[in-house]
Structure formats: C-alpha cells, structure tokens
Amino acid sequence: MIKAGAVLVALLAMGMPEGHATKKDLWMFIAEMSASLRTLSNTSVNDLPLQFTLTKDNEYIHFYHADDVRLADDMRITGIDFRVSKERDGMAPLLNFSPSGLCITLDAVKKHYPELVLTDYPRGRSGNEVTSYTAPEDINGQKVSFSFSVNKPDCLDSVVINAGND
C-alpha cells in the first residue's frame, strides 16, 4: 500500500498518462527523470516515476517503453523508451523521448542548458538525420542531449538522458 501511494505521488508530480492534466513542464520532466535514473538498477526499474513495460531484450540489454505523458500547455511526451543493461557494470541506463504539442526552439533549450556542445550533425544520407547538442556531464556523470531533425530543424525532436559514464 505504501509503494502504491508513493507511485501515485510520483505520477502526480511527474505528469499523468495521456488523458489527465498536469502543470509540469518539459524542463521539470527532464529534471525528475534524470534524478530517477541516478539510482537506477536493473532491479529497480519499477521504482521509476513512470510505468515501463519490457518490450524486448537481448543478451545484454532490456528495452522498455512507457505510455505518453501529458504536461502543461498542451505539451506531451511521446515515444518514451528506456534501455538498461542486464549486467551490473554494463552500459549506463539510457532514456529517450520526444516532446510534442509546442515547438521548443534551440534558444529555449539554451535558456535551461546554456553550455550545449554540438555532438552530431546531418551528413546528407537521410531525411531522418538530426543535429544534436549535449549539455556538459553533471556531477553524477549524466548527460542530456537535445536533437533537432532535418525535417523540422527549428523544433526539438527528441531528448536523450544518458545516466552515466560508459
């Protein structure tokens, strides 16, 4: 019962699955998911603030997916995918998702992450390529990257949180 109450509180704080309103914004969502990933282990996936479902795995990695989350101002978080190593010393947990509903510009991202570094750029091979900017590693070794697609270069396409050194 206590765990169910904690999950409810976390969901209320994080944003609600599709269909429920909340006042949380994208930046709070990123901060809370980053904080959750810091203490994550393969056995604590169920302790994350979102309900993740195992979608596939291989010899080394579990792949999870979560339902869309509605945030304030008609923002939604979609395509929420999470990877975690099966091995204690394996790759760092990785969370990626796409914001939708409002166009988040690079200037808006830089207001929250002013020290972004260009880490990837289109090479002309596909319309699905992205330009990515990564914030400096925090004290826990986490990095947050922001990608803008060739097809819609002015609006944030996806966010990746790499939960540690690897």
Predicted segments — roles?
Residues G5-A13:
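Bacterial N-terminal signal peptides
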Residues L11, S85-E87, P136-D138:
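Generic marker of residues within folded, mature protein domains
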